[in-house]
Amino acid sequence: MTKLVALIVGLLATPVFAAATLVQTSDNGTPDHVQWIDYGTSTQSMTFGSNLTNGNSVICGAGAYHSDSGLEFTLPSDASTNTYTERADSGAQAYSRAYVWATHAITGGISSITLNMPGLTGGLYGQATCQEWSGLAASPNDTGCQATLAGTAGDDAEANCTTATLAQAEELVWCLSHMASDFDSNVNYTDPTTGTWTNVFRVQDAATNSAGSADRRTTSATTAVVVQYGHDDLPATTDRWSVACATFKVAATSTWHWRRRR
């Protein structure tokens, strides 16, 4: 009995975080993985190449231009009636708004998700994308940040935001930035300046008054994440920026190891 107790006491469980895995990205347009939100639409279908898998997570983001502050998306929906939550919203302003939504432990068997923009008084332009992920924690939603910026002509400031301290070291950070630019053919978006990011899509040409970028990274510390995009000087006072970011905890497994007894 004494030996058994000693054996149990001598074993310790240490949490080990396995990297979250990207399963697939919606792929509706050009460039890859971006769906253009057309002028005057109230819904937009986001289509995947394969059916979604039971138990996985889906993260969606959208950014759009609208001529007044009436631009507002409601929650996404799908045929499996999965429940989506709004993880980040840059907030209402004229010309630009960005969102991030997510749903977890999904009921799969579907290959499309609908983004909803009801009640608009006019048309809008924008971009959106959705990704399916596996390997997130059972309760993955952690923190996030959002911001807007109203520029002036020749201004190279950007919408930036900083998350709160993360709940754990290993988290997925997912951001979408949108820029309403005065028919600029290339806004020269760059990756966020802090950390190493993977781009999901990037639209540099704002010929329809709408440029955008979605980006993600995995953290290795609980330090707050600073998100700051770079771009060219704004060509007009009507230009606007918005950014929305959310963080998601990665699932942990336990690794047993021996502890030397003193």
PLM region spans:
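Sec-dependent, cleavable N-terminal signal peptides
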Residues: 1-20
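Primarily extracytoplasmic/secreted proteins
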Residues: 17-262
